């Protein structure tokens, strides 16, 4: 759901570099296999998802061949998190939600018109799954209590940091102002 330290924060125990070395090795040694990365887009995905799209595209390009049953070497299957609601993209400020749209635009840029073995890039399905996250983010229901969920988010990251020995604000400096404002309020 992200890259580098932010991915390692959300997937505690993950070594980001080792993960990608293993994906690369897997695709190299098994040229008929397709890797499907299932990503649950959440409030912490916003800042590095575009970088993840770059990385997946790099692997698509490097490992494209005509031996695979599924055309692409690697697919990014993006879903959005609904529960727990305090980790949903709906808690974010509008400026952060715009980053979701930028990720969808990047996937569209890397998209392919024809899904054939001699092409590489993001399929229309991969692109649409990222686009719908933006629609979900801006389409906040009147039943969604943004203020309560933001408070619960702060409680969650504070408890997470205490238990794991991590530091949310250092890992996600883009959310420092959001964190401070919602911790007070």
What is each PLM-predicted segment?
Residues 1-185:
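Radical SAM enzyme [4Fe-4S]-AdoMet core and its adjacent flexible, acidic
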